[in-house]
């Protein structure tokens, strides 16, 4: 059973998170207003029969709340849900990105990406190209 104080803390964090939609912030604020009286001091009178009433708020979940801009792009990535890869533009691997890192660990990460069945073909292709670039740079 979730701790009501932690649920309230999460709702308060939602209010200050810049990656959360205005609609989600409004729902969090409504939740805080309706559930904070007495609970901050440890009074759990809002619970009925040991059950947490917090789950009632999930009934009006709006999937569009995760989209927070005019283009309809997910705040955590693009339309497909993938987060933009910072290595997508320009060189896949720049020397300053490798500086201070164990090159064999970097290579191992790319190799793991290529063999991971949960990774898209696009990511595997990028990993292959990055490995080729690393090999070219280390041989030069």
UniProtKB/Swiss-Prot annotation:
Coiled-coil segments on the chain, per record: none
Chain intervals for the UniProt region annotation (Disordered): 1-88, 110-140
Short name of one Pfam family: Con-6
Composition skew (Polar residues), residue ranges: 34-44
Recorded family membership: Belongs to the UPF0654 (con-6) family.
Origin superkingdom: Eukaryota
Lineage: Eukaryota, Fungi, Dikarya, Ascomycota, Taphrinomycotina
Protein name (record): UPF0654 protein C22G7.11c
GO cellular component: a single term: cytosol
Entries under PANTHER family matching the protein: UPF0654 PROTEIN C11D3.01C-RELATED
Compositionally biased intervals (Acidic residues): 54-71
């Amino acid at each position: 059973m979730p701790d009501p104080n932690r649920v309230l803390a999460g709702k308060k964090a939602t209010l200050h998170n810049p990656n959360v939609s205005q609609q989600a912030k409004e729902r969090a604020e409504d939740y805080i207003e309706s559930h904070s009286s007495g609970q901050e001091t440890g009074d759990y009178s809002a619970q009925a029969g040991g059950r947490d009433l917090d789950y009632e708020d999930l009934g009006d979940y709006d999937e569009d709340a995760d989209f927070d801009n005019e283009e309809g792009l997910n705040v955590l990535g693009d339309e497909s849900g993938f987060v933009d890869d910072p290595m997508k533009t320009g060189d896949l691997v720049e020397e300053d990105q490798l500086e201070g890192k164990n090159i064999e660990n970097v290579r191992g990460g790319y190799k793991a990406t290529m063999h991971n069945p949960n990774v898209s073909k696009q990511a595997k292709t990028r990993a292959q190209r990055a490995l080729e670039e690393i090999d070219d740079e280390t041989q030069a």
